[in-house]
Amino acid sequence: MFGSPFRPAWVNPDGMQVKAVILAGGRGSRLAEETEVRPKPMVTIGGMPILWHIMKIFSAHGVNEFVICLGYKGYIIKEYFANYFLHNSNVTFDLKANKMQVHENEAEPWKVTLIDTGEDSQTGGRLLRVEKYLDGDEAFCFTYGDGVGDVDISALVTFHKAHGKLATVTAVRPPGRFGTMSLDGDTVSEFREKQVGPGSYINGGFFILSNKIFDYIENDATIWEDKPLRTLSSEGNLVAFRHEGYWQPMDTLRERQLLEEYWQSGEAPWKVW
């Protein structure tokens, strides 16, 4: 069976469970060979969607409630979870008797809410559309559906609660081609997309956000990484959680192959469960 023993959802000091919101609506144009037939988060690593790997990372730290932001080919993600036990269990079909027997059901302790956030909504717009499904939670996790890492989610949540600002972003050191953040201590003093230099930190996703961040998002056209993050940064309300461990996005076929090779080696760095 995949996974570790059941862990209850991470509970903040006020007794509320922390949910994880995952963006899963993009088209993944640089993975066209894979994403013509499925949404990018359903591209597989080791036979399992990268979305599943991301959820396992959170679940390893006790975060078991998820809100998934659907868009492009979102029905495929709905069908995957509707038939999750079939995808991950051995079954016997007795066609004559019209019966099905499930063997060794590979269940997860997850509650998954799947929300259509629009075919063409931007990242901020997708986040805004799921606000009402967070039940007014004081804080929640938020990340992209195409990147994995050995991020310590428990430490990340604790860090966010300690500094008291509105947003925490996981800052990572990547291979090139990403935007950068200037750090003043842990505070993000400037946020710039698509400008990277040697030794820079970038936005690695794995955010912890206060529900007050919805005041910074205007509509479906709002790009989360643009005005909202820049405004939070200029106000001193965006704090960086420095992650010096493994982090890898899956934006190209080459990166997918890299992740697949790690998984097949039995030494996938993001496998923290």
Language model segments and positions:
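Conserved beta-loop-beta/alpha segment of the NTase-like Rossmann-fold superfamily
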Residues: 6, 77-185
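Catalytic-core segments of class I nucleotidyltransferases/pyrophosphorylases
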Residues: 138-143, 148-161, 173-176, 187-273
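Structural beta-sheet core signal
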Residues: 20-22, 68, 142, 167-170, ...
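Well-ordered alpha-helical segments embedded in enzymatic catalytic cores
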Residues: 53, 126-129, 228
